[in-house]
């Protein structure tokens, strides 16, 4: 029986693809200059994850093991192309902002990794839930990273939200303080590396504190085996 709580825990925290597995670092560090770009890439990745997991789970019994990886990649590429065309049609500004990193979702190790490790061994519903949780965990990391970099670099939040949600979303932009010159270190990839390292360190500290608060399980006493030789 599938443990959905464990799947959610793995995707959102314990085995988070961004903070623990460190997968998809290239787009994660390059595109997250603003929270809008981070959300756009995260949602696109999550849609592809869910769709690829479902399709891989449905065809797993019909694909020979020898050619499963090329078949999985073709499925992922078809889904990425579909998502790319949808973003191009309905969120053209976001499409331009994400650039080459949108089609590069095909090569994202998170997607092919979940297809091989989970979707190819479980039913469609469980695979879809795994894709949702892994995608949501990745999107949360992207969002926190993008929000932190945008605040430090521009002093704003949700700048350019109209690219993702439409013209009405211009009113969502929050100006936290006036910035005459953007803080380039936060806006460029080196700043993303630093913020990402701090997020990983924060997660490790939280895990350590939680582990210390858990009751210690007493170790079982060791049993010493003695060999008795009967004499006489």
Swiss-Prot record:
GO terms for biological process: electron transport chain. The chain crosses the membrane at residues 18-38, 39-59, 69-89, 93-113, 127-147, 182-202. The keyword DNA repair does not apply. It is found in: Cell inner membrane. Its EC number is 7.-.-.-. It is a multi-pass membrane protein. Belongs to the NqrDE/RnfAE family. Part of a membrane-bound complex that couples electron transfer with translocation of ions across the membrane. The complex is composed of six subunits: RnfA, RnfB, RnfC, RnfD, RnfE and RnfG. NCBIfam families: PRK12405.1, rnfE. This is Ion-translocating oxidoreductase complex subunit E. The gene is rnfE.
